[in-house]
Amino acid sequence: MKILLLADQAEPTLWEHLNRKRLEGVELILSCGDLPAEYLSFLTCFTNAPILYVHGNHDGRYAKKPPEGCICIEDTIYVHGGVRILGLGGSMRYSRGEHQYTQKQMAQRVNKLRLKLWRSKGVDILLTHAPAWQLGDETDLAHQGFVAFRDFIEKYHPQVLAHGHVHQSYHYDFARVRDHAGT
């Protein structure tokens, strides 16, 4: 399955200078958060692929104007073409903003999903905004990853953890792909 993964920064070839070839063959679009609702809504006009999203720490505006035609999968397992995707948005709490959690709060969110995870026999993709603890995160509080995500990877072994929040614009040698516990 061809999946387009989006996070944090609108891609100009899909937004300002639409290149429809970039969407050819895409069967699913996943957003890791912090993208304008208008951007995601715009993409629904050019593809039949479902667009699934989780909230980033800057997505408080979605409460008033969510991305039209897109599906929020927060705390939900969504199945598309046999691929099981779990969404857990938000970042580490560093201010009073929306979609921010403490380590304990995120662990509680994950814990509440145990029955769903058992029924679905796990997930193939864990879609998050923040990274897992010590797997692509930064040392400052705002960009630290969640221990609950690392524990999740080690327990459930999804094929992929897709996250945003920390990206190449922070430093040139940012690793886009990592392997941990088979994920």
Functional labels for PLM-detected ranges:
Residues 1-46, 118-122:
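N-terminal active-site segment of His-dependent metallophosphoesterases
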Residues 5-7, 28-33, 50-56, 126, ...:
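Short, hydrophobic beta-strand segments that form beta-sheet elements in well-ordered domains
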Residues 14-20, 37-41, 71-73, 111-115, ...:
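A generic local structural motif
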Residues 34, 131, 166:
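Flexible loop residues that form catalytic
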Residues 1, 83-84, 159:
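Secondary-structure boundary/capping motif
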